[in-house]
């Protein structure tokens, strides 16, 4: 099933993506795109597998996206080497361990460039005290591969051995940034390309000055790397988990000019306009911010109409998109007031139809 995933095929698939993007955005007067390729193998830091039980045997499976048929997975060439090593070691260790094996239906892996690993094991059964005892033994055995933590999940249960996050280190422009990444929260899966995205955004905002507002800031991925280019940064995020991670990451990186508030872009727009007062903003005077630059990294649905109207109020817009189709729709509105200065293609997902794009727009 993975025969197409090979370094010999990488350049051709990337070239096709360039052609597809040029065709999709042909109605816009785009500058020549900046292109940021991925390494051709072992680039994903996250992977999820179902577990198939067959007599005494058990193995990972995935499902064909077109036929929906299951297929066996012993190696996963797009995942990090650390994940591939852990995949094999985990099954070999639990194969004859009933407490860890019985009713196990899924395993999720989260690894880092810094060499840490988090494994989540999902069950169709309640987890008893014996499960934790055996999970601690499993952790000790797998720790010969890398620093590892294990999470057991069942209905209304979550057992952590010993933490539910990893600490990633990303090198951007010769500087290392540290990020807490929590299980089940969003992180960029291709860490190498993420480093390139952060560098591109850093360089695009050099000497920008003023303040940066980031909507959908997640764990502070962009805000932290861009903080040095701005006087102040204000990030908004609706996930409590991501807000907590962002606060930790701000502290870990010794940054003192970022604030994070938990609210949606719609709520932030209402606060900016003075339409509503929020207790969460009691310590912030939004009238003191210089609303010059905004960064948005929305979900696949893109920006809704109200959010488009919000970002149009800024002189500079940095738009990171995981869905070119919704980006195209949003750009059709944004180019009425702004011009496209930079356009970038980030190959976050080689050998798939998906591509991450970045656009810098400035007011006409």
Swiss-Prot record:
S-adenosyl-L-methionine binds at residues 188, 216, 221, 237, 297. PANTHER family: TRNA/TMRNA (URACIL-C(5))-METHYLTRANSFERASE, TRNA_TMRNA (URACIL-C(5))-METHYLTRANSFERASE. The active site is at residues 322, 356. One of its GO terms (molecular function) is tRNA (uracil(54)-C5)-methyltransferase activity, S-adenosyl methionine-dependent. InterPro entries: MeTrfase_TrmA_AS (IPR030390), MeTrfase_TrmA_CS (IPR030391), SAM-dependent_MTases_sf (IPR029063), TrmA_MeTrfase (IPR011869), U5_MeTrfase_fam (IPR010280). One of its GO terms (biological process) is tRNA methylation. Dual-specificity methyltransferase that catalyzes the formation of 5-methyluridine at position 54 (m5U54) in all tRNAs, and that of position 341 (m5U341) in tmRNA (transfer-mRNA). The lineage of its organism: Bacteria, Pseudomonadati, Pseudomonadota, Gammaproteobacteria, Alteromonadales. GO terms for cellular component: cytosol. It comes from Colwellia psychrerythraea (strain 34H / ATCC BAA-681). SUPFAM superfamilies: S-adenosyl-L-methionine-dependent methyltransferases. It catalyses: uridine(54) in tRNA + S-adenosyl-L-methionine = 5-methyluridine(54) in tRNA + S-adenosyl-L-homocysteine + H(+); uridine(341) in tmRNA + S-adenosyl-L-methionine = 5-methyluridine(341) in tmRNA + S-adenosyl-L-homocysteine + H(+). Belongs to the class I-like SAM-binding methyltransferase superfamily. RNA M5U methyltransferase family. TrmA subfamily. Its EC number is 2.1.1.-, 2.1.1.35. The keyword DNA repair does not apply. This is tRNA/tmRNA (uracil-C(5))-methyltransferase. Pfam families: tRNA_U5-meth_tr. Keywords: Methyltransferase, S-adenosyl-L-methionine, Transferase, tRNA processing.
């Amino acid at each position: 099933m993975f025969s197409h995933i090979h370094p010999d095929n990488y350049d051709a698939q990337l070239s096709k993506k360039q052609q597809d993007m040029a065709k999709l955005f042909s109605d816009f007067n785009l500058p020549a795109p900046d292109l940021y390729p991925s390494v051709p193998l072992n680039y994903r830091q996250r992977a999820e597998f179902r577990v198939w039980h067959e007599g005494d045997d058990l193995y990972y499976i995935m499902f064909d996206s077109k036929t929906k048929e299951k297929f066996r997975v012993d190696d996963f060439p797009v995942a990090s080497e650390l994940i591939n090593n852990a995949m094999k070691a985990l099954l070999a260790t639990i194969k004859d361990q009933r407490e860890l094996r019985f009713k196990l239906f899924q395993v999720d892996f989260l690894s880092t460039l810094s060499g840490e690993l988090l494994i989540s094991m999902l069950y169709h059964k309640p987890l008893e005290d014996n499960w934790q005892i055996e999970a601690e033994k499993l952790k000790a055995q797998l720790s010969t591969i890398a620093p590892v933590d294990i999470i057991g999940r069942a209905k209304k249960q979550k057992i952590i051995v010993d933490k539910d996050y990893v600490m990633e280190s990303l090198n951007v422009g010769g500087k290392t940034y540290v990020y807490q990444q929590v299980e089940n929260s969003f992180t960029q899966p291709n860490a190498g390309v993420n480093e390139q995205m952060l560098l591109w955004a850093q360089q695009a905002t050099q000497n920008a000055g003023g303040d940066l507002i980031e909507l959908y800031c997640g764990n502070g991925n962009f805000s932290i790397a861009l903080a040095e280019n701005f006087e102040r940064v204000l990030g908004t995020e609706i996930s409590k988990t991501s807000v907590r991670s962002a606060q930790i990451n701000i502290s870990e990186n010794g940054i003192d000019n970022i604030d994070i508030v938990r609210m949606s872009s719609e709520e932030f727009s209402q606060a900016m306009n003075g339409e509503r007062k929020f207790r969460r903003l009691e310590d912030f005077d939004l009238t003191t911010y210089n609303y010059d630059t905004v960064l948005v990294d929305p979900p696949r649905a893109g920006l809704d109409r109200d959010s488009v109207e919000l970002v149009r109020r800024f002189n500079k817009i940095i738009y990171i998109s995981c869905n070119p189709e919704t980006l195209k729709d949003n750009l059709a509105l944004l180019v009425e007031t702004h011009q496209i200065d930079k356009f970038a293609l980030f190959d976050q997902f080689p050998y798939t139809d998906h591509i991450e794009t970045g656009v810098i727009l400035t007011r006409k």
